[in-house]
């Protein structure tokens, strides 16, 4: 198997912190699994140079040795999917593109039913990566 899924599987094998990313994703409700797989595969497929690991039991793509230098992390709750980044200003600038979301200082919380938010969320991830000089691979 090749492509983003095989990349994620290889990274899962190397993930630390106990539970693998796949185990974490499999433990989520169905809606949460779908969002989590879609966005972890998006990042792994388009940004294969960014290390994928488990951080505090959640999937994270970390740019450098410390998360303080930049990351994209995803978490799932019962009714919403959350994207996290340390780029607080990008989150603030993105607010108008997510009318049904709620926000934290470093997070965008999107209800699973808000399928229209998926494309702006991909673009947010792309903006975070561009800011940190991460090349997009297709």
Question: Could you tell me what each predicted segment is?
Answer:
Residues 1-138:
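Charge-dense, helix-prone N-terminal extensions
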């Amino acid at each position: 198997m090749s492509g983003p899924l095989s990349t994620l599987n290889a990274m899962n094998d190397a993930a630390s912190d106990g539970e693998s990313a796949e185990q974490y994703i499999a433990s989520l409700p169905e809606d949460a699994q779908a969002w989590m797989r879609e966005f972890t595969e998006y990042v792994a497929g388009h940004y294969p140079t960014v290390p994928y690991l488990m951080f505090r039991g959640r999937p994270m793509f970390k740019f450098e040795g410390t998360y303080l230098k930049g990351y994209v992390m995803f978490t799932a709750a019962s009714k919403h999917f959350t994207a996290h980044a340390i780029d607080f200003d990008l989150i603030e600038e993105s607010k108008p593109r997510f009318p049904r979301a709620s926000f934290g200082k470093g997070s965008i919380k999107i209800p699973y039913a808000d399928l229209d938010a998926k494309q702006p969320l991909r673009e947010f991830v792309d903006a975070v990566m561009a800011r940190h000089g991460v090349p997009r691979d297709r």
